Amino acid sequence: MTTTSERPRATQRTAKPEGQWAKGEFDPLNPNEVFKAEDAPLNVRARILEQYAREGFDSISGTDLRGRMRWMGMYTQRKQGIDGGKTATLAPEELDDEYFMMRVRIDGGQLSREQLRVLAGISTDFARGTADITDRNNIQYHWIAIEDVPEIWRRLEAVGLDTLEACGDCTRTTLGSPVAGVHPDEVIDATPAIDFIKANYVGDPDLANLPRKFKSSIAWLPDAAPEINDISFVGVVHPDHGPGFDLQIGGGLSTKAFFALRLGAWVPLEEVPEVWLATVKLFRDHGYRRLRNRARLKYLVEDWGADKTREVLEREYLGRPLLDGPAAPTPKHTIDHVGVHRQKDGRNLVGFAPIAGRTSGAALAGVADAMEAAGSDRLRLTAYQKLVVLDVPDDAVEPLLETMRPLGFDGRPSPWRRATMACTGLEFCKLAIVETKQRAHDLVAELEERLAHLDDQLEHPIAIHLNGCPNSCARIQVADIGLKGQIITDTAGEQVPGYQVHLGGGLGEDLVVGRKLRAHKVAASELGDYVERVVTRYIAARESGESFGDWARRADEEELR
């Protein structure tokens, strides 16, 4: 007779293979792995040029259309007129429009005036005037027809730009500091490492089939969101070896947020590409390929921890130990470079805030004209949907500010315009549930009118991030006020667009995922009322020097509703 204490244990289930190549698990375990195994994604470029652009949209195969074309920076955009409530119920082909979103990768965010003019012209000629500055230094177009892609590529490549691997399971655009090479506090300009990686590894077939996307940040200043990238190199001075970079691995947001872990290693500038490449190969070989929602590097790093990750990196991929090193400094607040700031050469950099990154081809052409009038040939895009013009002489600053404002670029913005971000949203994204870009524009206008009397009482802007779905392209978990789009039931019992609220998130010194308000959602039409209510309560209840995030994390939930 078996007693309770002798009850047999349940049979332990055999762990399913995760598709880790390092373990010899090469059989594709999901549809994405199948199409990548059937034909290398980079091969789609030839079909676009030789077949699809000539024969039209209907000639595109399904696995190219919804799979491999991502490696060329292209997604089909959302068919117009389909409401967010149908996002999860319709088949992919029912959501597909016959036009594409196209993402131009701009590694380091660095552009010349000539390149900007080309980007503006493409928007006007092929994208119905659309152009969005993303939070990864890129430019995104919409309404791109397949027939126009060869000419767009020709124009981009003529000025050193491209769309290669701007999307897909590959090495995405590398974030860099928008003030690299010009900021007075910068000790090392990381641009050579970014340029080397782009020139030598992007488009390498050996690195073009990763388990999921791989995002990088390489910057001396901590102004390129290092905490939420797959790999980050952040500037730090080693007490014995001088300036170099602190290595951090395994960050990412999406539906489950992870902050990158320090490996405790210091990397000199000349070794950054080598360590970056070794990490990409580690991810390629050891990363999980069974479930798409667990295939990012962050899940492997979570399972391994920092020590094992470093040990495998050193032993299997570098063949040598890394030097131990100190942690990089962390900023107390977001560094967005908006406003007028002195460069190390005595000239000025001027940062501008379009609302949630939205602009147009005509506006970008106007920016190029304004730069030319100011004597500037260089600009940068930021990790916060902003634009920075470099090399502006003192006597050209005010004219530049005045010229840029009517173009939608404000160099002295309200705190609401300055700190509001939004993803693409329902207008064009097939994953979205609610609209975001226009909602952000309307919200900023509303807050500028309703809360202007509080602007001077805010030591730092309150970051408001709007996302059209749970995937957090607009980083809702690390915003002061993060708004995750969903369909909600309003007080009248109607299904309407709304948002789940996250409060008190942050990067830098305030590195924390925002608290989610349980059972509290806000209708899109009531966002202005909600933000006014919670900001007013913060102003009234805050302690001396207390930020919005600090207050939101300690406040009673009723105060936050």
Across the structure, where does each feature detected by a protein language model lie?
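Mobile "lid/hinge" segments at catalytic clefts and subdomain interfaces of large enzymes
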Residues: T2-L29, K36, G203-E311, A479-A540
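Small-residue-enriched alpha-helical segments and adjacent helix-cap loops
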Residues: T2-R7, M74-Q77, Y99-G244, E274, ...
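Flexible, glycine/charged-enriched surface loops at secondary-structure junctions
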Residues: G129-I133, A166, D204-P211, F283-V301, ...
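Long hydrophobic segments that form regular secondary structure
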Residues: K332-I335, V340-L349, P354-L381, L527-R561
